[in-house]
Amino acid sequence: MSTPVDHRAGPSSAPRSTVRADVAVIGGGVVGHGIAWEAQRSGRSVALIDDAPGSGASWAAAGMLAPVSELHYQEEDLLELMLDASSRWPGFAAGIAGATSGSGYLTTPTLAVGADAADRRALMDLRAVQQANGLAVEPLTVRDARKREPLLSPAIACALDTPADHQVDPRRLLAALRQALAGAVRGKPGLAVAGAVEGYAVPDRAGGLLWEGGRVVGASLAGGGTVLATDTIVANGLQAGDLGGLPDGLDLPLRPVHGDILRLAVPQHLQPLVTSTVRGLVHGVPVYIVPRQDGTVVIGATQREDALSDAVSAGGVYQLLRDAQALVPAVAELELLECTARARPGTPDNAPLLGRVPAAPGSAGYKAGHVPGLIIATGFFRHGVLLTPAAAAICAGLLDGHADPRWAPFSPERFSRPAAARTNHHTKETV
């Protein structure tokens, strides 16, 4: 017997339709699509809920797969996750490529470049930390760096080779994942979700989680329908913290970290502008230039916490072009095609919120140790594209009942009151 809908799960209007799937994934960015594809590959039917899939941070992202370059002090747990994800990328990309026209994954290396003596010291200090963690970063002479990348400025102060840091084109990746999800449904009709577009897509916004018998059983939709599922995975980035029906006391402290990013066309006489991803420091400010297979480059990215939302900052565009030109002067001759700004979902420790939610004493999931039917996968900050294969594998393991203890530091509960101090998660049913 059901009771009235909990107000936190959105408007209590009667559902216009009900979609049923083994797994509901809330959020259609790269992470959500990757999780959905991995769940589908395990033989589960998947409903991917998003009213504008691929339009958020994933659309703007440069797609650097850079666990070595992205190492920061006191982020060893995150480094282990990034290295795990990096090791999964070849197989992940090959699986997508086998089902589609290609994922946009490239194993081109990364070149770290410093513009002045202070930048050189900063990069060498970082190299010491990288080496202490067993990571390969080799100094190059400026002459050798310019042999590899002839359009680098002769005035740069240093260069370091980072062969393990690669790249993927997130826009191509998203298109390939959509193609793979739809193709799997066509190949195995049993995976099709009735009422979903192409057998998997639910083009609506999730209003809130639905509960029954103390477990999460799906999500309500802003348009009035519902998605019922054995497991629901919350992967909608910044919107996750505002989702209705989250377990009582669960705090998902997500903050928007905006970034401006540019896309430019390289004239024929300058192609290739660079063949490696160039990550630079220019007077202490980071900038990168990522080459694409179509002859364009991506230059990014600022990092700002302001009120501009998705508006592009004029100062950010100026800074990016100025600093990129300091490293590769020919940037001045490129055609500016696109300026984009999006917000990345950051957390207080810059690490993701990833895993099941511990259950409160007396709740339906207390014996199992977690809230039944719910997985959180958000807060990936700068690393969403890189971490996608790891997040997908971790969620697939959780669906099968396996929790890898290595990833306990990323528990989505770590900024909340401990489960033992919380009351029963839900006393009302919402379906």
Role assignments for model-derived ranges:
Residues 64-148:
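Dinucleotide-binding Rossmann-like beta1-alpha1 core, especially the glycine-rich loop
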Residues 24-26, 227-239, 392:
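Short hydrophobic core segments
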Residues 330-431:
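C-terminal catalytic lobe of FAD-dependent flavoproteins
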Residues 21-47:
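N-terminal Rossmann-like FAD-binding beta1-loop-alpha1 element of flavoenzymes
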Residues 34-41, 51, 63-64, 101-105, ...:
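Active-site substrate-recognition segment that forms the wall
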Residues 80-83, 113-122, 160-179, 311-315:
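Short beta-strand to alpha-helix junction loop
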Residues 1-22, 41:
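Extreme N-terminal leader/targeting segments of oxidoreductases
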Residues 160-223:
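Helical element adjacent to the flavin cofactor pocket in flavoenzyme catalytic cores
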